[in-house]
Amino acid sequence: MQRILTRGEIETLDRTSIVRLIFPAADTFATRAKRLRELAPDNPIADYLRLIAKLADAQQQVFSQEHAIPAIDERQLAQAQAHGMPPFNNRNITRDKRWREQLAAIVELLLADGSLAEPIRTLLSSLRTDIQQQPELIEQQAEALLNVPAEHPEVKKIEAARAPFIMAALQVYWSQLVSTLESKQLPAHTPFGLCPCCGSQPVSSTVMLGGPKEQIRYATCSLCSSQWHIVRVVCTHCEDTKQMAYHTLEEGRAGIKAESCDHCQHYRKIFYLDKEQFAEAFADDLASLPLDILMGEAQFYRANNNPYLWQLAE
C-alpha cells in the first residue's frame, strides 16, 4: 500500500531531483474533452460539461494544425532571464492576429455541429460577426480577460457568456507559444504562484502518481496548460504555510479537495491521482462546482476563475 508522506517529509524532499516544469502535451485538449465526457453523467451541470467537451475538441483540432509560430525572440528571452520573468508574459507581450484566426476557427468548428443548442448557436454567430467586423472589440475583451482583476471597473468589458470561447482561443495560442520553449531557457526563479512560461495563475494543482513525480505537486497554468512544481505545504495564492486546511464534500470523491488558506481567505482545488487516477486540472475543477459552493459558504474565495466558466464579481 502506498505510504502518505508526512508534512516534514514533504518539506525535506530533494528539490534538485524534481522535474520543475511539464510543457503541455500534444493531446492536451483531447484528454480534457475525454475527461469532461466521463464526468458529465449524473453531474448537476452535465449539459455544460458536454458543451465544453465540444469546445475542447475544437481546441484540439486548431492546436494540432500547422501554424507559423514566430521564432523565439532572443532579446525577449535574455530580458526574461535577467529579470526573472516568464518569457511569454501575458501582460506585456503583443499578441498577433493569429489568435483571432484561431478563435474564428474554433467558432466555425462549433457551428458545424448540428446538435448545438440554439442559444449557443446565436451566441457564436454574434461572436463570429464581431471577429470579422469589430476585431478591436475582441482584442479589448481578450485584454480584460487576461489582465483585469475581478474587482476592477474594466471588468465590465468582459461578456461572461463569450468568455469561455475567447479564452479557449487564447489557451491554444499560448500553448503553441510555450511549446517552442525548452526548460533551460526559463529563468531559474520566477514570481511565486505564477506560470514560469506565461505568468498566469494556476487553475488547480495535482499530486502526481508514479515514477519520479510520485507524490509531487504540480500547479497547472490556466492559460498555457504548462505544469510547474509547487511544494505541497504552501498556499498557491499567498505562499503562507501555517494556516492551510483541506475540504471535501461528504459524498464527494476522495481524490478532490479544496485547499484553503486562512491567511488570505482564498482556495484552489487540489487533485490526488492515487485516488482519482484520471483527474484533469480543468475538467475536474469544472465538474466539482458543489465544492465551490461549500467553500463560498465557508467565506473563502476562489483564487481565480476556471477559464471555461467565467464568474464576475458581484
Predicted regions and their residues:
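Short N-terminal signal/transit or membrane-insertion segments
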Residues: Q2-I10, T16-R20, S126-E139, P196-S204
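Cys/His-clustered metal-coordination modules, chiefly Zn-binding fingers
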Residues: Q176-L294
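Charged, low-complexity interaction segments
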Residues: M1-T31, E38-Q79, H263, Y267, ...
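Short N-terminal helix-initiation segments at or just after the protein's N-terminus
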Residues: E136-E139, A161-A169, Q201-L209, G296-F300, ...
